[in-house]
């Protein structure tokens, strides 16, 4: 497809579910090197692992233990009930080489010759993307959506031009195009 040449890959993440009472009641979400949510429906969520080059969709005890270790570091002496049973889910993040999201018109990877600026690179008409949030989707998604809406409607952009360019999906092609190399983006998204 038109996005298959973007330099994106998938990164495994495992979230652990802990029964209410397995950790002290929290008035808020804790977040540092990991996160721990308040109980919702009797369950706390804790996580998540960040497993590069790992396509295993199954829950693993080792990932669960990693999450529990991170929860212990968040809580300090407040405690965690030992031996929480293995429960949770596995998901896969979409990640780019610089870990910034890709927001805007998707580039056409057809060889183009020399290009000095992002706006000089060809795009697929009418094809836009909001992807590659890595583990920061909750932070980036609202701003990225506002940026894309402004681009689509021709409205003033909500960000400075340098940040808009840092998020442009064609940014990975620009260096090659400046050197007059054939424009070919990085490896496609890995699939299991």
What are these regions (language model features)?
Residues 1-125, 187:
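Active-site substrate-recognition segment that forms the wall
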Residues 77-192:
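C-terminal catalytic lobe of FAD-dependent flavoproteins
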């Amino acid at each position: 497809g038109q996005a298959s040449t973007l330099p994106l890959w998938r990164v495994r993440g495992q979230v652990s579910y802990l029964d209410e009472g397995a950790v002290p009641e929290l008035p808020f979400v804790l977040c540092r090197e990991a996160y721990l949510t308040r109980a919702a429906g009797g369950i706390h969520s804790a996580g998540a692992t960040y497993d590069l080059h790992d396509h295993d969709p199954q829950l693993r005890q080792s990932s669960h233990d990693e999450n529990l270790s991170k929860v212990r570091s968040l809580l300090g002496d407040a405690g965690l009930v030992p031996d929480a049973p293995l429960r949770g889910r596995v998901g896969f993040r979409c990640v780019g080489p610089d870990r910034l999201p890709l927001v805007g018109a998707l580039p056409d990877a057809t060889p183009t010759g020399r290009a000095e600026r992002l706006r000089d690179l060809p795009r697929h008409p009418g094809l836009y993307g909001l992807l590659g949030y890595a583990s920061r989707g909750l932070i980036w998604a609202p701003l990225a959506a506002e940026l894309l809406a402004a681009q689509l409607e021709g409205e003033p952009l909500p960000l400075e031009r340098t940040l808009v360019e840092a998020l442009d999906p064609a940014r990975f092609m620009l260096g090659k195009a400046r050197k007059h190399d054939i424009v070919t983006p990085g490896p496609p998204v890995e699939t299991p």
